[in-house]
């Protein structure tokens, strides 16, 4: 059994059982991957993948267990490399962060600028996607950190640490009837077409929850994953915008009126997540604390030692998080 074979079977699953796509991603040949997978199956005396002709159709029950363990083994191999790197070149390495557009555009720029200045020999890579894609990327080992608000609870294998609370703002054009109001009720908001985030992005679930709680149905006419796109369509008069407050800037958005929505929606919490098996390099601890100053190395280590994310939630229950 070779590590290469374990990597191949994991990557085949990551590429939805498409061996050709797997070969392209690994810069190798399709026959080479197929041969190594067969050799591993022959050695183990069991099928990892069910087949129809030359095509893989599904992972067998035994294969699912083997894939799970293979992921753990490969994660440990990565940890060994990280330990060696920490002792040899503590300020050199790589960091892969998976996050949403809102975090990348509005919450992370200052953090990343300071981090790169401090660690010029660490290559930082950012992947943007939906919260589900982000959590999955970290769960599969394709990213070190997931930073998001939605969907991280779906991945129990991630350690999830609360970073900050945030809420939404209502944005309208100056000529809109709501523009002169000091405050807006959810009943008033329900009277207008809304422009907001796609479901599953940037706290959208809280918007739906607030309307359901009030027995109302929001009239959503346009959704997008990008707050800048939403603001563009608000300017075009398509509807009332509901976006993260941090995404509205009086300097860059002087033509929009920002209305507080704290009385309508409950706050959301952005978290940073990573695999429990991840060996955190010193610069990774530093990145976490730059993003969330209350998450010191000692606090992170204490949280990682807890058994579940429910225990982590309890640990932070009485800690006042920053507001954005």
Swiss-Prot record:
Chain ranges of the HTH lysR-type domain: 1-59
Biological process according to GO: cysteine biosynthetic process
GO cellular component, one term: cytoplasm
Gene3D superfamilies xref list: Periplasmic binding protein-like II, Winged helix-like DNA-binding domain superfamily/Winged helix DNA-binding domain
MF (Gene Ontology): DNA-binding transcription factor activity; transcription cis-regulatory region binding
SUPFAM superfamilies according to UniProt: Periplasmic binding protein-like II, Winged helix' DNA-binding domain
Annotated localization: Cytoplasm
Keywords from the named record: Activator, Amino-acid biosynthesis, Cysteine biosynthesis, Cytoplasm, DNA-binding, Transcription, Transcription regulation
Main location: cytoplasm
Lyase among keywords: no
DNA-binding region: 19-38
Family to which the UniProt record says this protein belongs: Belongs to the LysR transcriptional regulatory family.
Role of this protein: This protein is a positive regulator of gene expression for the cysteine regulon. The inducer for CysB is N-acetylserine. Thiosulfate and sulfide act as anti-inducers.
Complex formation: Homotetramer.
Record-linked NCBIfam families: PRK12681.1, PRK12684.1
Protein name as annotated: HTH-type transcriptional regulator CysB
Taxonomic lineage: Bacteria, Pseudomonadati, Pseudomonadota, Gammaproteobacteria, Enterobacterales
């Amino acid at each position: 059994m070779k590590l290469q074979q374990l990597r191949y079977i994991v990557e085949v699953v990551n590429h939805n059982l498409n061996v050709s796509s797997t070969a392209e991603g690994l810069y190798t040949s399709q026959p080479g991957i197929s041969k190594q997978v067969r050799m591993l199956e022959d050695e183990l005396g069991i099928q990892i993948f069910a087949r129809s002709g030359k095509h893989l159709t599904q992972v067998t029950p035994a294969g699912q267990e083997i894939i799970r363990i293979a992921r753990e083994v490969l994660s440990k191999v990565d940890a060994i490399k990280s330990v060696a790197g920490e002792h040899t070149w503590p300020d050199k390495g790589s960091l892969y962060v998976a996050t949403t557009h809102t975090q990348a555009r509005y919450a992370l720029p200052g953090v990343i600028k300071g981090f790169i200045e401090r660690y010029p020999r660490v290559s930082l890579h950012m992947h943007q996607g939906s919260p589900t894609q982000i959590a999955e990327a970290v769960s599969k080992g394709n990213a070190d950190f997931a930073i998001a608000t939605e969907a991280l609870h779906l991945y129990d294998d991630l350690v999830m640490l609360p970073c900050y609370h945030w809420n939404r703002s209502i944005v309208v054009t100056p000529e809109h009837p709501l523009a002169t109001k000091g405050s807006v009720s959810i009943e008033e908001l329900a009277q207008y077409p809304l422009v907001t985030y796609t479901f599953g992005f940037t706290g959208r679930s809280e918007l739906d929850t607030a309307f359901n709680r009030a027995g109302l149905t929001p009239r959503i006419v346009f959704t997008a994953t990008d707050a800048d796109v939403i603001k563009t369509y608000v300017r075009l008069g398509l509807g009332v915008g509901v976006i993260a407050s941090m995404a509205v800037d009086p300097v860059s958005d002087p033509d929009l009126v920002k209305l507080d929505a704290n009385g309508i929606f409950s706050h959301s919490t952005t978290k940073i997540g990573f695999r429990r098996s991840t060996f955190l390099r010193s610069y990774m601890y530093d990145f976490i604390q730059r993003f969330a100053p209350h998450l010191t190395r000692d606090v992170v280590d204490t949280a990682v030692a807890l058994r579940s994310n429910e225990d982590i939630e309890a640990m932070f229950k009485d800690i006042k998080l920053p507001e954005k």
